[in-house]
C-alpha cells in the first residue's frame, strides 16, 4: 500500500515548513513508521511518526481527531492488521484519540499514525519484495523473519547491500 497517506483520500499531509510557518509550532520529527503496515502478499502502507511542540514561550491545545486508535485496519484474505494509532506526550502521558487537550509549555506530543492492513497471505509475498522492504527500512529484521520467513542468508545479502550502498 501507499505509505504515510490518509484514507480514503490517499493524500499526504501539509509540508512541515508550511505548518511551522503558519503558527508557533515546531515539528520535531516526521518519518515513516517501520513495521506498521500489515504483513501480506501486498504489504499494508506504513504509518508515520510525528512529534510536535510549540515554540519557546508558547503552549497549545491539540484537537485530536484520530482514527484507528482502538481498532487497527484489519487484514484481508490472510493479510495481517496494520498498527494502531498511538498518541502521548513526550513524558509518556497517554492522550485521548479524540477531543481537545492541553499541552503545557515545553511538552511535545508524540503521535504514531496507523499502518494499512496487509492483503493476502504473507507467505505469498515475493522474496525480492520482502528483501527490498527490509533494505528500505519499511520492515525490521524481526518482521522479515517472523512474518515473511526470510532466511538468514537473504537477510545477510540485504545487510551487505546496505553496507556497500547497493540497491536491492
Q: Where in this protein do the model-derived segments appear?
A:
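Glycine/proline-enriched, intrinsically flexible loops and inter-domain linkers
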Residues: 1-168
Amino acid at each position: 500500500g501507499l505509505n504515510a497517506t490518509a484514507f480514503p483520500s490517499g493524500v499526504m499531509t501539509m509540508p512541515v515548513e508550511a505548518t511551522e510557518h503558519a503558527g508557533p509550532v515546531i515539528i520535531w520529527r516526521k518519518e515513516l513508521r517501520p513495521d506498521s503496515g500489515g504483513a501480506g502478499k501486498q504489504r499494508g502502507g506504513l504509518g508515520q511518526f510525528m512529534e510536535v511542540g510549540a515554540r519557546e514561550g508558547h503552549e497549545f491545545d491539540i484537537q485530536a481527531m484520530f482514527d484507528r486508535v482502538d481498532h487497527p485496519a484489519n487484514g484481508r484474505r490472510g493479510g495481517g492488521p496494520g498498527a494502531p494509532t498511538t498518541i502521548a506526550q513526550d513524558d509518556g502521558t497517554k492522550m485521548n484519540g479524540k477531543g481537545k487537550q492541553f499541552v503545557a509549555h515545553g511538552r511535545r506530543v508524540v503521535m504514531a499514525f496507523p499502518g494499512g492492513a496487509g492483503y493476502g497471505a504473507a507467505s505469498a509475498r515475493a522474496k525480492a519484495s520482502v528483501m527490498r522492504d527490509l533494505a528500505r527500512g519499511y520492515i525490521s529484521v524481526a518482521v522479515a523473519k517472523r512474518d515473511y520467513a526470510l532466511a538468514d542468508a537473504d537477510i545477510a545479502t540485504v545487510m551487505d547491500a546496505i553496507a556497500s550502498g547497493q540497491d536491492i
